Amino acid sequence: MGSLTTNIVLAVAVVAALVGGGSCGPPKVPPGPNITTNYNAPWLPARATWYGQPYGSGSTDNGGACGIKNVNLPPYNGMISCGNVPIFKDGRGCGSCYEVKCEQPAACSKQPVTVFITDMNYEPISAYHFDFSGKAFGAMACPGKETELRKAGIIDMQFRRVRCKYPGGQKVTFHVEKGSNPNYLAVLVKFVADDGDVIQMDLQEAGLPAWRPMKLSWGAIWRMDTATPLKAPFSIRVTTESGKSLIAKDVIPVNWMPDAIYVSNVQFY
């Protein structure tokens, strides 16, 4: 009889745990709707965290899930952030820009600063979640209060989408990824002004009129797989989220190499 009673108690406990979620951690918050190119949208609430070194640019390799490297250097200058699902958008949010600010705790300056999305973080702590580099998180603080703000760990914040601006003369830039060859071309795109993010890239081979759609590989990297060798130089058409397009004519030359950077002469201005 005692065994039966014990089994009943255990069964009730299991059901209660299932009904209650069976978890001691914080509740998981579903992601919000995707952020679009509505630049007149009001400020939205989010939660902010930070990672890496206190004054650093996030990842130890100065990169992230977009594939963009050296984010510690200009023009990013370490002012970068991971975005959750509706911000990162499986890589199609890479390069987009946001004004961010906080009002509490007291160390917050309440003044907006601009960050670039170069990484992802899917921790379900808020409908919108920015996981900043240490430098970017501290930039929301009053002067001299950066360390105090970082000690807060997780804070409430506000954000809004803004157009990306780069220093004068900065053009759309392409990096041919390691492992690329005449039958497999993988290209990272960066320094895209205005919308910042790219929703489609197309490639035109030398001497051919047709544009061939590239596939999003991961992050900000687009690829072309082909059974027949591609003929350089290559022109690349870049289309951003709002539907704007530009063409980088013959941007990847005849003697192109893997792991090489090619700077175009065009920009979304």
UniProtKB/Swiss-Prot annotation:
Glycans are attached at residue 34. Residues 1-24 form the signal peptide. Its main location: secreted. One of its GO terms (biological process) is plant-type cell wall loosening. InterPro entries: Expan_Lol_pI (IPR007118), Expansin/allergen_DPBB_dom (IPR007112), Expansin_CBD (IPR007117), Expansin_CBD_sf (IPR036749), LolPI (IPR005795), RlpA-like_DPBB (IPR009009), RlpA-like_sf (IPR036908). Disulfide bonds join 66-94, 97-164, 102-108. The keyword Membrane applies. Keywords: Cell wall, Cell wall biogenesis/degradation, Disulfide bond, Glycoprotein, Membrane, Secreted, Signal. It is found in: Secreted, Cell wall; Membrane. It holds the Pfam family DPBB_1. CDD domains: DPBB_EXPB_N (cd22275). Residues 63-169 form the Expansin-like EG45 domain. Residues 183-264 form the Expansin-like CBD domain. One of its GO terms (cellular component) is membrane. It is a peripheral membrane protein. The keyword Cell wall biogenesis/degradation applies. PANTHER family: EXPANSIN-B3 (PTHR31692), EXPANSIN-B9 (PTHR31692:SF7). May cause loosening and extension of plant cell walls by disrupting non-covalent bonding between cellulose microfibrils and matrix glucans. No enzymatic activity has been found. May be required for rapid internodal elongation in deepwater rice during submergence. Belongs to the expansin family. Expansin B subfamily. This is Expansin-B9.
